[in-house]
C-alpha cells in the first residue's frame, strides 16, 4: 500500500477554486520528529480561461506546522521517507463541478487525455450530480511540485 498510486479529487467551489492537503509518514515510528514525512498542498485556482491545479511542498515553507507538538527548525524534502515514495504517482485527477468541458488539459508541454461527463457546475443553482472531468495518468508524482492547466 505504501507505493500504491493516488487519485486526487478536486471539488470546485462556487468561485472555481479548491484546496486540500496530504500528510504522510510511515505510521509506525516516531521518525516524523526528525522530519521523515511528506506534507503536500493542493490548490485549484480559476481565471476566465483556465483552471490551474498545483501541488506544492508545504513542509519546506512551514516545518513547524506539519506535526502537532513537534518543532522542526528545518525540513528536507529529500528525507528518507519522501525518497522511499519517489516514483509513487498520481494515477488520476478527478475535477468535480466544471461548467463546460475543457478544450485541452496540459501538464507542462504535454497534452493529457481526459474524459468529461456533463453535470451540474459548482457555481450554478441547479441540483443534481456534479460534472466530472477525469484525467488519467497525468505524469505527476505525489512527492513532486507540479501543475496541470485546464483550458476552458
Q: Where do the language-model regions lie?
A:
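Solvent-exposed serine/threonine-rich low-complexity stretches and specific carbohydrate-binding patches
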Residues: 110-122
Amino acid at each position: 500500500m505504501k507505493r500504491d498510486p493516488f487519485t486526487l479529487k478536486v471539488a470546485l467551489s462556487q468561485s472555481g477554486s479548491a484546496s486540500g492537503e496530504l500528510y504522510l509518514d510511515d505510521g509506525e515510528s516516531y521518525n516524523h520528529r526528525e522530519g521523515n514525512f511528506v506534507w503536500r498542498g493542493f490548490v485549484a485556482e480559476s481565471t476566465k480561461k483556465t483552471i490551474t491545479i498545483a501541488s506544492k511542498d508545504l513542509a519546506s515553507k512551514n516545518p513547524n506546522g506539519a506535526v502537532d507538538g513537534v518543532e522542526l527548525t528545518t525540513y528536507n524534502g529529500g528525507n528518507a521517507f519522501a525518497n522511499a515514495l519517489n516514483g509513487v504517482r498520481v494515477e488520476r485527477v478527478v475535477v468535480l463541478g466544471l461548467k463546460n468541458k475543457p478544450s485541452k488539459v496540459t501538464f507542462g508541454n504535454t497534452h493529457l487525455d481526459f474524459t468529461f461527463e456533463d453535470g451540474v457546475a459548482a457555481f450554478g443553482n441547479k441540483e443534481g450530480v456534479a460534472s466530472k472531468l477525469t484525467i488519467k495518468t497525468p505524469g505527476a508524482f505525489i512527492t513532486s511540485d507540479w501543475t496541470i492547466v485546464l483550458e476552458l
